[in-house]
């Protein structure tokens, strides 16, 4: 990454931190993955039960591995041997002490957009876990909420779809077709614009490109 890009991300990150705090979120800006991992671990109490959705950004900074190997009660859905066991682990995440998530997009004004297929991730963001910890690269930040919704639908979702064997138009074309496919992964669109209780949702913004 160029020095110009680093400075650009830092300046926008500082603006976003301020705007997130005005909406009662906790927010921190970290210039790189290593400092983001350090900050994230400071925000997770030892011994806490920790679950996560499809948190690719958290995985990329090493947070998922740190939780699995550290002094935490990891709720790892990928450890399930059956579909029923996996479903039970998803439900347990809804009462975890800490839930790790990414963000499909953020507006510079401090609103978060997420799109889900099953809905387990957006459910946990809305209610349940004591703390929601969002790891987001600065590539997710858009100028406006409309831009953020567009990014989530036309960039994040089609890219995320490539991880799954479902049959949707975006698997073939790479572009959103606003489909109603049975396999659609865009069934819930959540806009999180404020935090109550204050500080329940915490953001670690990373001055790198992470996730989709």
Pin down the residues of each PLM region.
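Iron-sulfur (Fe-S) cluster-binding modules
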Residues: 1-23, 39, 158-166, 171
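N-terminal start-of-chain detector that recognizes signal peptides
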Residues: 1, 21-24, 71-74, 85-87, ...
């Amino acid at each position: 990454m160029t020095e110009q890009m680093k400075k650009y991300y830092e300046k926008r990150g500082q603006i976003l931190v301020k705007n997130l705090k005005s909406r009662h979120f906790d927010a921190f800006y970290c210039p790189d993955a290593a400092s983001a991992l350090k900050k994230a671990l400071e925000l997770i109490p030892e011994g806490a039960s920790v679950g996560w959705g499809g948190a690719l950004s958290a995985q990329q900074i090493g947070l998922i591995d740190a939780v699995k190997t550290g002094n935490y009660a990891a709720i790892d859905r990928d450890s399930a041997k059956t579909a029923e066991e996996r479903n039970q682990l998803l439900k347990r995440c809804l009462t975890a002490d800490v839930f790790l998530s990414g963000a499909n997009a953020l507006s510079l004004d401090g609103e978060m957009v997420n799109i889900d297929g099953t809905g387990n991730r957006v459910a946990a963001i809305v209610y349940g876990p004591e703390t929601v910890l969002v790891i987001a690269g600065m590539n997710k930040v858009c100028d406006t909420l409309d831009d953020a919704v567009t990014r989530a639908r036309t960039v994040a979702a089609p890219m995320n779809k490539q991880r799954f064997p479902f049959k949707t138009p975006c698997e073939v074309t790479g572009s959103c077709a606003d489909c109603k496919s049975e396999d659609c992964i865009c069934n819930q669109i959540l806009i999180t614009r404020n935090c109550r209780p204050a500080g329940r949702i915490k953001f670690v913004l990373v001055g790198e490109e992470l996730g989709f």
